[in-house]
């Protein structure tokens, strides 16, 4: 199928049906690279491109023709952001209407694309008149961010629209970072170490995992720098029992095993069987010791469904969240999240914290983390939890480049070119 037609279908499913772009792309294997570029770019700039399309259309398209609307946005994205010959963009985008079985739209698409080419500067200036168009985010989210981060809101929105870096975590149980950097250099892959993390490497340009030396042999794992702090903040010691709640796909589970291979037990829990299998696949590829690893399919908040009664020395709760700290990696979040979602995430996190606190040993640590930048999912959750529990105290969390808050540390998107992430370390008093 024409890549522009496929893109229009996928973008339309995100906009109309609130489908995850990651899930849609995983089911579509043909022309993956270009389709991914077109989908990500169109969704990244959706709220800007949408204003242009609405201005140029004499009347709104019918709901059943929203795929054509998305196709037009895809054309605008290519014309403004990609280095593809103009005639190729116009011909391919117009031709996609035929494949979508809507040949009547070919003339309309051709007209709008050519108007965009002729009036581009004027149209882009027009989008700057509204804050949604200027920053390419939904209004409700901009308002939330301005309220939460009055000194940082603009830099957050700008970072959300940037292309994210590709960051690796070197598997130090197999190879040193210095030697792996040499291997990358031999493959002409430009990279630099991130000095604030022992195993992190950032590539100058993203590449396919198949180009990474030793990837299949487990020499590295793809993980943003913001998430690589978790295993160190846990203060792991030999012979401890550790729980990784909400563990899939295993980024932090595997890192825990790399940082300390001599744990007594590591229990990784997730409620999705397919995602749980990915934990096992990732740890197998990395060649990590698994004799003390237990992967359990369960709702971690329902303690009686999975617990043997054993208490844990360390618990990592990387809680399900709005993922508003990783919009640059998942631009569909701008369309998938709604204002009412945030209070639901808040309550779910409190439920998880309360449940997991009961299986933490006295003298143990629970690390709470999210990839959100919204206080309702972060500081306000910890504040409410502390107000209802006596034998708990905050432990210092030192994260390079993070903002120290009353109840934890917040990394904002773009700081040191990291994703947005929140950490709060809780100590259970004896």
Curated annotation (Swiss-Prot):
It is an enzyme of class 2 (transferase). It catalyses: cytidine(967) in 16S rRNA + S-adenosyl-L-methionine = 5-methylcytidine(967) in 16S rRNA + S-adenosyl-L-homocysteine + H(+). Keywords: Cytoplasm, Methyltransferase, Ribosome biogenesis, RNA-binding, rRNA processing, S-adenosyl-L-methionine, Transferase. One of its GO terms (molecular function) is RNA binding. The active site is at 371 (nucleophile). One of its GO terms (cellular component) is cytosol. It is found in: Cytoplasm. Its main location: cytoplasm. S-adenosyl-L-methionine binds at residues 246-252, 270, 299, 318. It comes from the Bacteria. The keyword RNA-binding applies. Pfam families: Methyltr_RsmB-F, NusB, RsmF-B_ferredox. SUPFAM superfamilies: NusB-like (SSF48013), S-adenosyl-L-methionine-dependent methyltransferases (SSF53335). One of its GO terms (biological process) is regulation of DNA-templated transcription. The keyword Thylakoid does not apply. Its EC number is 2.1.1.176. PROSITE patterns: NOL1_NOP2_SUN, SAM_MT_RSMB_NOP. Specifically methylates the cytosine at position 967 (m5C967) of 16S rRNA. Belongs to the class I-like SAM-binding methyltransferase superfamily. RsmB/NOP family. This is Probable ribosomal RNA small subunit methyltransferase B. It comes from Coxiella burnetii (strain RSA 493 / Nine Mile phase I). The lineage of its organism: Bacteria, Pseudomonadati, Pseudomonadota, Gammaproteobacteria, Legionellales.
